[in-house]
Swiss-Prot record:
It is a single-pass membrane protein. Gene3D superfamilies: 1.20.5.3310. Part of the twin-arginine translocation (Tat) system that transports large folded proteins containing a characteristic twin-arginine motif in their signal peptide across membranes. TatA could form the protein-conducting channel of the Tat system. Coiled coil: none annotated. Residues 43-55 have a biased composition (Basic and acidic residues). GO terms for biological process: protein transport by the Tat complex. Keywords: Cell inner membrane, Cell membrane, Membrane, Protein transport, Translocation, Transmembrane, Transmembrane helix, Transport. It comes from Nitrobacter winogradskyi (strain ATCC 25391 / DSM 10237 / CIP 104748 / NCIMB 11846 / Nb-255). The lineage of its organism: Bacteria, Pseudomonadati, Pseudomonadota, Alphaproteobacteria, Hyphomicrobiales. This is Sec-independent protein translocase protein TatA. NCBIfam families: PRK00720.1 (NF001940), tatAE (TIGR01411). The keyword Cell membrane applies.
Length: 78
C-alpha cells in the first residue's frame, strides 16, 4: 500500500497534463531554464568581482605631528 506502482504514476502524469496542458508545461520548463541560466551568470559575475584585488591604500604619517589630532587645551572647562 505504501509503494506507488507504474499505473499510479501514469494516472498522476495524465492528470497533470489535463490540468496544465502541453503548452503551459513547456512554458514553465523554459522559465525554469532561464532562471537557472540567470543564476549561473550571476555566480560568474560574483567570482569575477571577487578575483579583482582592491588597490592598496597608504596612510601618510608625519614625524613632527603636523596633521595629527588637535587638543583643546586652551578652552575653558566650567
Amino acid at each position: 500500500m505504501g509503494s506507488l506502482s507504474i499505473w499510479h504514476w501514469i494516472v498522476v502524469v495524465a492528470v497533470i497534463l489535463l490540468l496544465f496542458g502541453r503548452g503551459k508545461i513547456s512554458d514553465l520548463m523554459g522559465d525554469v531554464a532561464q532562471g537557472i541560466k540567470a543564476f549561473k551568470k550571476g555566480m560568474k559575475d560574483d567570482e569575477k568581482t571577487a578575483e579583482k584585488p582592491e588597490p592598496v591604500k597608504t596612510i601618510n604619517h608625519n614625524a613632527d605631528g603636523s596633521g595629527a589630532a588637535r587638543s583643546d587645551t586652551g578652552s575653558k572647562v566650567i
